[in-house]
Amino acid sequence: MARIAGVEIPSNKRVVIALTYIRGIGIKKAQNILSDLKEIDINTKVEDLKEQHLIAIRNKIQNGNYLVEGDLKREVALNIKRLMENGSYRGLRHRKGLPSRGQNTRNNARTIKGKRRTKNTVANNKK
């Protein structure tokens, strides 16, 4: 297995698919990276790549202004924190743990709202 951007990419897959194992790189970005590197064919498997090709891919990702892995997570977290500090509607929804993109919450939204909690009502307290 080759290590690129701190991620072990599988050696039995094609390079374009293996690059998508890196957070922040999808199919399109992987194709763009490989199209800039003329000597690497998109259909080549990772195990068939030479060390110089792996170094070229690493350099392209590092120097190509791609936000990957930890940097991407940090950027997203800072964006959410900025929204919450601004007091914007989206920030308030994040703070309350509710969907921030306009979805209905009457019936669904269990993923973001979390597990149901029973309220302390008079009926629950009587025993």
From Swiss-Prot:
GO terms for cellular component: cytosol; small ribosomal subunit. Signal peptide: none annotated. PROSITE patterns: RIBOSOMAL_S13_2. It holds the Pfam family Ribosomal_S13. It comes from the Bacteria. SUPFAM superfamilies: S13-like H2TH domain. Located at the top of the head of the 30S subunit, it contacts several helices of the 16S rRNA. In the 70S ribosome it contacts the 23S rRNA (bridge B1a) and protein L5 of the 50S subunit (bridge B1b), connecting the 2 subunits; these bridges are implicated in subunit movement. Contacts the tRNAs in the A and P-sites. This is Small ribosomal subunit protein uS13. It comes from Phytoplasma mali (strain AT).
